[in-house]
């Protein structure tokens, strides 16, 4: 059984920090999957094609693990 670890995440919109939090997961990969789902949902809440939404994950020692930036996706076309 793996022991849970804590990861810090910071979400930015167009370079400005808008939220910070802690992800609790047993592995880095699990934290990354959760963050992808969260960031994807968050990006849909911003203006498509103009807003850049990014997320940075570090471990509790402050070691940088990943940072990704997404252009907020365009809405799905209506049929």
Predicted regions and their residues:
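Short aromatic-glycine-(Arg/Gly/Cys) micro-motifs in beta-strand/loop hairpins
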Residues: 1-19
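Short acidic, gly/pro-rich beta-turn/loop elements at beta-sheet edges
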Residues: 18, 33, 67
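Charged, amphipathic alpha-helical segments
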Residues: 26-45
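A general secondary-structure boundary signal
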Residues: 9, 22-26, 56
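Intrinsic-disorder/low-complexity peptide segments enriched for small residues
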Residues: 6-9, 30, 37, 63, ...
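Short, mixed-charge low-complexity intrinsically disordered segments
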Residues: 40-79
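A short, exposed loop/beta-hairpin motif centered on an aromatic-Gly-Thr core
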Residues: 16-30
């Amino acid at each position: 059984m793996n022991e849970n670890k804590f990861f810090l995440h910071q979400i930015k919109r167009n370079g400005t920090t808008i939220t910070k939090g802690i992800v609790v997961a047993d592995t880095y990969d699990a934290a990354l999957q959760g963050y992808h789902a969260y960031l994807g949902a968050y990006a849909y809440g911003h203006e498509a094609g103009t807003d850049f939404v990014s997320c940075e994950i570090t471990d509790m020692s402050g070691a940088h693990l990943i940072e990704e930036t997404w252009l907020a996706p365009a809405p799905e076309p209506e049929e």
